[in-house]
Each structure stands twice: as structure tokens, then as C-alpha cells.
């Protein structure tokens, strides 16, 4: 019964693995709900600041903030990539990496240089292996993103844009669709998207804010805060996506472990049955010989 003992050991090992994946699934489910609530709570602020920032940026044609001026000759771009710090979340990070690699190939083919800010340990490791020029990084964001942690790496990119070291800024993250679906998303942060002609016309005839002492410092501060809020929202969406993907991955692992245990038990029972049958046959044969 050496084979039977081996199979029992395998069954015990898979059962222990299943306990771990089941526990991780439950933890991820709890974190997912909190991350979704946090992400949804941040959306109204992001939408409101987007409206205010857009209004401020285009309401004063006499002052054009650098964030709204598109540059004709794009020689270098900045890329902020948001990923998870930990693995075991299915193909979440791999899907984001695929989008990044495809876009980087297009930029490189056009002779455009790339500076990278990596938020998340997985993205940092990937970009370093890729040989990318990582100018800033942030790891250990945790389950609750804090703006004071994000400001440092993001400001490095914003300063690079203001100083002309990069001509455009992009953000890559996993957008949360639902528990079963997360979509890798590449969005342009800078320069800000040009307004539609209808929106532009409405600004000229619509109300405006009263600025004290003047509009410039208000516009400068608001647009900076707007870009920071976009990055924060991207990180919040990515965390919700990560926990959802991890819960689904751990559930699949638990289900697979259950199937493997069933198959191993079947093999064990067949092996045991064959051993018993063999012993009985030997006993009968011995009795017949006597």
C-alpha cells in the first residue's frame, strides 16, 4: 500500500492548499467591498473637480495654462503605470503590461523617449526588467490609497511637463467594470483634452467665478489638484480591480483543488480496491493449493 500512502499524502497537501486559497478568497471579498465603496465615494469628487477645472482652464482665453497647451513636436512622454504590490490576482497586471508594451513600441517606433513613474511593486519590477527609464516610484500603497503618498511621484512628472522635459503625460491602470471584469486603460492626462466647440461657446456666454486676487493662482492650483485627483481615482480603481481579480482567482483555485481532491480520492479507492482484490486472490489461491 505504498502507492496508497503516497496518494493520501497528496490529498492532505491539496486539502491544506485549499484551506489557504479559501481563506484568501474570503479576505479578498471583504477587501473588495471596502475598495469598491472607497472608489465609488471618490467618483463624485473627481467628477465635480473635473467640471470646475475644465471651466477654469478655458474660461480665460487671455491666460493659457501650460497644461492645456498641446505641443506640436512630442519628443518625450511621461507614463504613470499603476499596478498591484502583490500577485495572485489572475491576469490583472499582465493585461496592463500588454497595453503598456504595445504603446511603448509605438512611441519608440516614432522616436519618442519615455520616462516612467511606477506605482505598485509589480509594475516597478516589470519596468526595470524591461529596461525602462524609471524616474520615480511608489510601492506599499496598501489597500487604502492616500493622496499625501501619491503627490511625490506625481509631482515629479508634473514638474517635468512644466519644465518641458516631457511633452505629454499618460496614465495606465485597471478600470473597475464589475467583480468579474476589469479593463486595462490608457488615458492621457496632459495636455488636457481640448473642449468641444459647443462647450467652448457656452463658456463665453455662461457665468464665471469671482477670483481674488486674480485668476492665475486659482487656475494653477486647481489644475494641479485635478491631475492629482485623476491619479488617485486610477489607483482607487486599480485596488478595487485587484481585490476583485484576487477573489475570483482564489475561488477558481479552491474549486480546482476540490476537483483534484475528488480525483485523487477516486484513484486512492481504486488502488485500495485493487490491493484488497489481490490479497483475496492470493488467499483463495493458497486455500485451493492446500
UniProtKB/Swiss-Prot annotation:
Keyword Transport: yes
Function: Produces ATP from ADP in the presence of a proton gradient across the membrane. The gamma chain is believed to be important in regulating ATPase activity and the flow of protons through the CF(0) complex.
GO biological process, one term: proton motive force-driven plasma membrane ATP synthesis
Membrane topology per record: Peripheral membrane protein
Cited SUPFAM superfamilies: ATP synthase (F1-ATPase), gamma subunit
Keyword annotations from UniProtKB, A to Z: ATP synthesis, Cell inner membrane, Cell membrane, CF(1), Hydrogen ion transport, Ion transport, Membrane, Transport
Protein's name according to its UniProt entry: ATP synthase gamma chain
One Gene Ontology cellular component annotation held by this UniProt entry: proton-transporting ATP synthase complex
Database matches in Gene3D superfamilies: 3.40.1380.10, ATP synthase, gamma subunit, helix hairpin domain
Family: Belongs to the ATPase gamma chain family.
Origin superkingdom: Bacteria
Entry's transmembrane regions: none
Coiled coil start-end: none
An MF annotation (GO) of this entry: ATP binding
Keyword Plastid among record annotations: no
CDD domains given in the database record: F1-ATPase_gamma
Predominant cellular place of this UniProt entry's protein: membrane
InterPro entries linked: ATP_synth_F1_ATPase_gsu, ATP_synth_F1_gsu, ATP_synth_F1_gsu_CS
Cell location: Cell inner membrane
Lineage: Bacteria, Pseudomonadati, Pseudomonadota, Betaproteobacteria, Nitrosomonadales
Subunit-structure text: F-type ATPases have 2 components, CF(1) - the catalytic core - and CF(0) - the membrane proton channel. CF(1) has five subunits: alpha(3), beta(3), gamma(1), delta(1), epsilon(1). CF(0) has three main subunits: a, b and c.
